[in-house]
Every structure is written in C-alpha cells, then in structure tokens.
Amino acid sequence: MLFNNITIALDMSGCPNRCKHCWIGHFKNGNMSIEDLKYVANSFKDYTNSLEVYSWFREPDFNADYKKLWEIDNELSKNTKPKRFELLSFWRINRDEEYVKWAYNIGVRRYQLTFFGLEEKTDYYVGRKGAFNELINATRILLENKIAPRWQIFVNKDNISEIEKLIDLSKEMNLEERCKEFGEEFELFIHQGSCDGENEKLYDIRITLDDLVNIPKEFYHRLGKREKDLYGELINDSSTKNLVTDFPVFYITSQFDVYPNYTSIAPWWYLGNIKRDGVKKVLDNYINNRSLGQKSSLEVPIKEMVKVCGDQNSNRLFDRDDYIIYIINKYCRNNIKFL
C-alpha cells in the first residue's frame, strides 16, 4: 500500500469563528500538541512517496505558536512542502502586529476574505460580533503590507439586498487601484457556496433565478443552474464515481478521527481512528470504499440518489458538482440508520 502523495491536515486548535456557511461543519476546538502532530505525520510516512503536512484544517494560524507550527509542518512533510492557498487568519491579523509581515516573508501575496453583506449580516454569519469591522481592518492592513485582498461574498435570499452595497464599498476603498500600486489585482466574486456542512442548513434560503436582478451580470458565472435543470440532467445519469485517488487528503480531528476532505465531516465519511485502529486500517477503509459515503458514490447511480433526494420543481441555484455532493450527503443521511 503506497500512495503517490498523501496530504494530512490536523485540527490542532480549531477556529475562532462559527460561520454559517462552513462546509466542514462545527465542532469543539481541540488542543492537540506538537507531539500529536509528529505522531500523526510519522504514522503516515511509510505509506506514501510524498507527504504534505498541515497543523490546521479550519482556521490557519489560529494557534499562538503559528510560526513554529509552520516550520514543523515543513519539517514533517516528505518530498514536498505545504502551501498557503491564499489563506490567512483575519482574526490574527487584527490581534498580532507581526503576523502579516511574517506572512509576506513566507511568500503570501493574496488573501481571501469572506463577507456576507454589511456589518449586521456578516457578524451574524461569521458567528461573532465585530467580524465585519475586523474584515475591513484586515483589508487595510493587507494593503499596507502589499498583500492583495480578495473579497468573496456569499449570497442567500436574506442578504442579497446588501450585495451591491458591498461592491460599492470595495470601490469607495479604491481596492482595485490600491492593489495595482504593488503589481497585484483585486478580485471580488459572488457565489452561494456549496450545500454541505453548515451551509446545507441554508438550503431553504438559497437564491433562485428571480433573485438575479439584485446581482450585477458580471457575477452570474459562479451562480450555477436551477435545481430542476440539474435534476433533469442527473435523473438520466447512470454513472457512479470512485472517490479513491492516489493523492488523497485526510482531515484528522482533535480526537484522531479521520475523514476524507471530499465534503463535510459527517459519520457516513468516517474512515477510522488513528490511535484506536491504526493508519493501515484507516487507509484500507479508504482504498476499499468502506465508508457509507464512498460506498454509495461507487455503487449507487446518481440517478437513483437524485430520484429520492432531489427536487424536480426547485428553482434554487447550484453549481453542478456542489449539487451532486449535496445529493450524496442527503442520501447517506437518510440511509445511515440501516448500517
């Protein structure tokens, strides 16, 4: 059993936010040690040609020892190095004067900030008061340090009236011009996000076709198709999908439970526990599609799942891949009691 590359991401410290769009899901913050990180990394090393190690999978750099952990992530990785993926912590940007300078020095040039409208809506969706003002302040601090902010806006029926106001705010702040001053581009994009984890709870308020009048046309390309149209495509689709790859990414919780990063952390994706079962059994479960999620994707045609879990009359908008993940999760939730 030898993979080409394995990526492992541990939830060492958790997250300061409880965002209502979080596709991973909500659970308690952990307090894993550096020894735990080393133990997990060393457990995987013999099963892969290269190993990419991350000490977080929710909020990057939330741990007070973030600098040391980044060094350890690099040291524990095998034949490769961890990446930043345009991700930082706006929570830390507002509390640590050294943080953005450090981020620039390790190569970060862009960082994605997430908004849900103006102050009240963004604070509500992030799950803590003051989040909106922290995002605006983080934008200013990034610009001062020649890191380009990218604004992503999550849209639902309850915040769509604020989208154009947020776009106007980005123009008032001259973000496009400010980024050009140091050779970067400002990007703002709008989407609903996936429909798994916490975001699945927002299914009822997903935008529909008639809501598009409230969004400038240049942002339509990320908003997808009506559910009824996707239903019509998939109801005739007999395909199944093997989710096993030679480059898997695994999430390890603070309790050492392992899940693939395909979608949210849910019981039907559980692969085992490193301490209780050992890495060999976890990987064997993955390779042989033993979780209900992987097994269903491999054995049940998507048309059978959409038939019982889709809505052929719905005008809600979805990206096609996100819709398929939503259907698989819903199917598994309905069937896990039969395991």
Language model features with spans:
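General structural signal for secondary-structure boundaries
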Residues: 1, 25, 33-36, 89, ...
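N-terminal pre-core extensions flanking Radical SAM catalytic domains
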Residues: 1-28, 249, 279, 318-339
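Conserved glycine-rich "GG(E/T)P / GGGxP" loop and the immediately following alpha-helix
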Residues: 7-13, 21-181, 188
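Radical SAM enzyme [4Fe-4S]-AdoMet core and its adjacent flexible, acidic
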Residues: 32, 116, 124, 128-254, ...
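Alpha-helix initiation/capping motif
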Residues: 33, 88-90, 118-120, 128, ...
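Extended interaction regions within the primary functional domain
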Residues: 40, 45-59, 65, 73-80, ...
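Residues that form generic nucleotide/phosphate-binding pockets
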Residues: 43, 125, 215, 282-286
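Flexible mid-to-C-terminal extensions adjoining Fe-S/redox cofactors in radical SAM and related proteins
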Residues: 257, 261-339
